[in-house]
Design a protein with these regions (language model features):
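S-adenosyl-L-methionine-dependent methyltransferase catalytic module, highlighting the catalytic core
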Residues: 70, 91-220
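Class I SAM-dependent methyltransferase Rossmann-like catalytic core
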Residues: 1-23
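Extracellular polysaccharide-degrading/modifying enzymes targeting complex plant/algal/animal polysaccharides
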Residues: 221-330
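Short, P/G- and charge-enriched loop/turn segments at secondary-structure junctions
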Residues: 36-39, 166-173, 261-262, 294-297
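Conserved SAM-binding loop
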Residues: 25-121
Length: 330
């Protein structure tokens, strides 16, 4: 897969506040760079080495990530492990994660760029983002960034900031096309590799249904488009939200009958509406109505002729100003 300009932009955005130590970096497989400046050099890292199961592409070190033990000379050697589409080809995922842990020094960073959807027969697996977030959270790593990229072609990708639970309510088929994830985590002191996580979706159901969906240190932000590593300007119209009425629990309703044609549906259509409270984005959108009512804290859903939403602090809207934006082309 390698690293293109969009992935390089997001990797820089994720690590700029917590740069890895100045040591060698390693890529899993020989990773081509598809244009743009070298993201590893921009982070001030040392030499970039590579690991692969064969020397067909001229890797630095021969290693099968399925193996039980790392060579002593590779343990703790690297400040960054970049997985640019290798993990899905390794049958023993747990062994590979253990070896990634072993390759990294303390405060080192792992970055996984992995297929999420649309890559049938590309590898053994397509990883949902919850796999990485739940695993690294359970093992005490610090999250630096979690992004979902919907690839549009021509160097364009729509980027979604991922937080746990944000798409629990999406119907089957809502995610179509080619999607990648970029998941970036730091191996802080005390981090582990061997804790087996329980999927957070079921933890929310069985342990604490009211737990906030923003977990693991990740925060929601509205989606945006990247074109060859540059944020694309989007022409959107901003309108004042009609006066809302109270619903159940933390839920509020606003009537938007003129927008019913772009609302979320059970067939998988996702509304492009973005909601703001005093100019600050709320979200995540497309939330389950029960989560809006029981959890709140900015969750919302544009469904049918109504916007179902919660305020950022679960207090009544009061004098706060609520606006929404839509692409001007609609």
């Amino acid at each position: 897969m390698g690293i293109d300009r969009n992935l390089a932009y997001l990797l820089h955005a994720a690590t700029r506040q917590h740069l890895p130590p100045s040591r060698p970096a390693v890529t899993l497989g020989v990773q081509a760079r598809h244009g743009g400046p070298d993201p590893f050099a921009a982070m001030g890292l040392g030499a970039v080495e590579s690991i692969d199961v064969s020397d067909f592409e001229g890797c630095t070190h021969l290693l099968d990530l399925n193996v039980a033990e790392l060579p002593p000379e590779l343990r703790g050697r690297y400040s960054l492990v970049y997985d640019g589409g290798t993990l899905e080809h390794v049958f023993d995922t747990r062994a590979a994660l253990r070896n990634i842990f072993g390759l990294l020094c303390t405060d080192g960073v792992v970055a996984h760029a992995s297929p999420v959807n649309g890559w049938v027969e590309h590898g053994f697996y397509q990883f949902s983002p919850t796999f990485f977030v739940d695993y690294y959270q359970a093992n005490g790593w610090s999250p630096l960034g979690a992004f979902l990229l919907h690839l549009r072609g021509g160097g364009r990708a729509t980027v979604h900031h991922y937080v746990s639970g944000m798409w629990d309510a999406l119907p089957a088929g809502a995610i179509s096309g080619l999607w990648l994830s970029l998941m970036v985590f730091r191996k802080v002191p005390g981090a582990r590799w061997d804790v087996i996580p329980q999927q957070s979706f079921y933890r929310r159901i069985h342990e604490d249904a009211s737990a906030p969906p923003i977990a693991a240190g990740l925060a929601y932000a509205p989606p945006f488009d990247l074109v060859d590593g540059v944020v694309a300007a989007e022409d959107r119209v901003v309108r004042r939200l009609p006066r809302p009425s109270p619903g159940v629990g933390y839920e509020w309703h606003a009537h938007l009958p003129q927008l019913e044609g772009v609302a979320d549906t059970t067939e998988g259509r996702l509304s492009p509406l973005l909601l703001f409270e005093d100019g600050r984005p709320l979200g995540p959108p497309h939330a389950a109505h029960q989560a809006i009512r029981a959890t709140g804290h900015g969750l919302y859903s544009h469904w049918g002729a109504w916007l179902h939403f919660s305020t950022s602090d679960n207090a009544p809207p009061g004098e706060r100003v609520y606006t929404y934006s839509l692409p001007r082309a609609l």
